[in-house]
Amino acid sequence: MNDGGLSELLKLAGRRAVPDEHHMARARAAAHGEWKRLVRGRRRRRLLWVPAIAAAVATAVLAPAWFSSHPAQSAGHAQAVAMADIEVATLQMVTGAITVTPRNAEATRLTSAGRRLSTGDRVETAADSRAMFVLSGGTIVKVDRNTHVSLGRGVLTLDRGALYLDAGPQANDRDVVVQTPLARVSHLGTQFEVRLDGLAVRVLIREGQVEMDAGGGKKWKAVAGEAMRLTADLRPERDQIATYGPEWSWVAELPRPFTLEGSTLRAFLDWVSREQGWRWEYNDQSMRALFDIVQRGPIEGLTAKQALGMVLDANDLSFRETEGRLVIVRGR
C-alpha cells in the first residue's frame, strides 16, 4: 500500500469521539444511584464492587451512543489497525554493519543486536556482515553475507543471498515459509539453508524435511542429508550432502543463544551438537552421571566449538570428532 492509501485509512479511523454531556450525566446518575443502594446493604462487602459496577453502567450507557453515531469511523479504525505492521522478530546478533529499512521509514544502519523487527522491514547484509534474529514463535533465522530479506507475517521473502532456519523443538511457528523468486520453501520441524544461486534456488537440509512449491501443482520434497537445486526451467537437481563440516561453517559463526550458567553439561552438549550438525556420545558408562552436573560461567561471544573445549576442560573431559560424531572422553 502507498502512503496515500495509508493516509486515507487513518483519516477514516478519525479521533475517538468524546461523549456529550447528556450521556455523561446519565452515567454519573446511574453510578451514584447504585452506590447509594449498596451503602444501605452490607457496606464492607459490597463496596468492593462499586468501581466495577460504575464502569459497567458507564459502558452500557455510552457505548451504544458512540457506535450508533460513528459506524463508519469504527469500521475504518478497525481496518487501519488490522493493516498496521506488527513486531515479528528480535535481532539477536550482528557481525559488521547491517541495514534495516522499515516499510515507510528511512533506512537505519545497525552494528549491534536488540532491535525489534516488524512486518515490512527489510534486512540487508553486506560483504563483511551477517545477522541473526529470532521470530516471535522461536524459530532462529541466520542471515549470510550479501543477503536481502523482507519480513512478513509467517513469510520471509528472500531476494538475494542466503538464510538458515532452525525451527527446533522450542519453536511454535513451524509454518513459517521462505519465498524466493522461483518457489516457496516450507518445512516440517527442521534445520535448513535456502540460497539464491544465480537464477536458481538451492536448499540444503540438515534436519527434518523441506518442500519446494513452484505453483501449478509443481512440488518437490527433500530430507536431511539432501540438497535440492531448482533452476529457472523448474527442473530440480538433487545431491547428497553432509550435515556437518565446511558447507555449514558460516552458520556456526552465528551461534544460537545459550546460557551455560545453571545448565547441565548434557544440555550444553545438545546445544553444541545442534549448532555443529554433530551427534554426541560417550563410550564409558561410568561417565553417565557427569552429564547431569550443573555448569557455571559465561560463554557469551564464543562459537559452540570454541565453548566446547573450554567447558569440557573445566570438567576434566575432552573430545574427538570424526565424521559428524562427537565422542566425549575422560582427561584433558
For each of these PLM feature ranges, what is it?
Residues L38-R45:
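Short, Lys/Arg-rich N-terminal segment immediately upstream of the first membrane anchor
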Residues I98-T108, R195, R235-R332:
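N-terminal export/assembly leaders
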Residues G114-R116, V149, S318-R320:
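Short, exposed beta-strand/loop patches in secreted or surface proteins that constitute
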Residues M1-H32:
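A short, acidic loop/turn at secondary-structure junctions
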Residues H22-W35, L47-A80:
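Single-pass transmembrane signal-anchor helices and their membrane-water interface zones
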Residues G138-K142:
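Membrane-embedded segments
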Residues Q73-A105, T119-D121, A126-R130, R145-T147, ...:
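Glycine- and acidic-residue-biased ligand/ion/polar-headgroup-sensing regions
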Residues T99-A113, P169-P181, V185-S186, E193-W271:
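Short, polar/charged, low-complexity connector loops/linkers at domain or secondary-structure junctions
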